[in-house]
Amino acid sequence: MEGVFTYLGGILGEDSHSAVLIAHLLLVAVIVIMIAKMATKSFRAVPNGTQNVMEAYLGGVVAMGKDVIGEELARKYLPLVAAVGLFIFVSNVIGIIPGFESPTSNINVTLPLALMVFVYYNYEGIKKHGVVHYFAHFAGPVKLLAPLMFPIEIVSHLSRIISLSFRLFGNIKGDDLFLWVLLMLVPFVAPLPAYLLLTFSALLQTFVFMILIYVYLAGAVAIDEEHEKAPAPAIDTMGAV
């Protein structure tokens, strides 16, 4: 955030905001890699310590995705969703520590994340169904409404980039500003309850981003299932007209 002291900003210079952002991104990357290394350093049949936490996390991600896309596909996309979730959570939480900045409070971080998800789920949909079949489902099951539905679906999919990036950016930016103001008014002791609230908010925003990845992937790869669920009587009626 502009004008807010950070330890890395003190080292690199507060004016070089891009360098400070990159430094915080590298710090988050190092933390994520360290967590992964600690969890995989020595596998045990009965997990303990970091391995236990990581296995619980991965199991929770699969359980979350299973309700959306099925267990097989939830496991297939587990590496992407779990990695993105861990990165976002660490990025969110690090800003709660005074003197550090959440990389996810910057649109230059959340927008590339949203673009990555957008490109990936469309790629998966095209890979499974082919270009023609994939984009044909944008027109919907009712052919007469295709000229109306196709542009609406295109706009709807493009708007996901904005909703994913700005939801995460706006919430984390607001949390950081809230904590900053609170620390200015009543430093150290009084903000302690706020830390719990902000940690919950960081967890919630991570969950929302992860579940939306599964939702978008489900919509891209489960086209046939969607069409099968379309009400047949409505299609027959329109065809008769």
From Swiss-Prot:
The reply to whether Ion transport figures as a keyword in the UniProt entry is yes
A Pfam family (short name) is ATP-synt_A
In alphabetical order, the GO MF annotations are: proton-transporting ATP synthase activity, rotational mechanism
Gene3D superfamilies assigned: ATP synthase, F0 complex, subunit A
User: Does this entry carry the keyword Transferase?
Assistant: no
Subcellular location(s) per record = Cell inner membrane
* Record-linked PROSITE patterns: ATPASE_A
Per UniProt, the keywords (alphabetical) are:
ATP synthesis, Cell inner membrane, Cell membrane, CF(0), Hydrogen ion transport, Ion transport, Membrane, Transmembrane, Transmembrane helix, Transport
Q: Which InterPro entries match?
A: ATP_syn_F0_a_bact/chloroplast, ATP_synth_F0_asu, ATP_synth_F0_asu_AS, F0_ATP_A_sf
Q: What is its main location?
A: membrane
Please give the biological process terms from Gene Ontology that the record holds: proton motive force-driven plasma membrane ATP synthesis
Membrane topology is:
Multi-pass membrane protein
Q: Name one GO cellular component term.
A: proton-transporting ATP synthase complex
The UniProt transmembrane annotation reads 19-39, 80-100, 106-126, 135-155, 177-197, 203-223
Q: What does this protein do?
A: Key component of the proton channel; it plays a direct role in the translocation of protons across the membrane.
Q: Which family does it belong to?
A: Belongs to the ATPase A chain family.
- Please give the subunit comment from the record: F-type ATPases have 2 components, CF(1) - the catalytic core - and CF(0) - the membrane proton channel. CF(1) has five subunits: alpha(3), beta(3), gamma(1), delta(1), epsilon(1). CF(0) has three main subunits: a(1), b(2) and c(9-12). The alpha and beta chains form an alternating ring which encloses part of the gamma chain. CF(1) is attached to CF(0) by a central stalk formed by the gamma and epsilon chains, while a peripheral stalk is formed by the delta and b chains.
PANTHER family in alphabetical order: ATP SYNTHASE SUBUNIT A, CHLOROPLASTIC
Q: What is this protein called?
A: ATP synthase subunit a
Organism encoding this protein: Sulfurovum sp. (strain NBC37-1)
Name the gene.
atpB
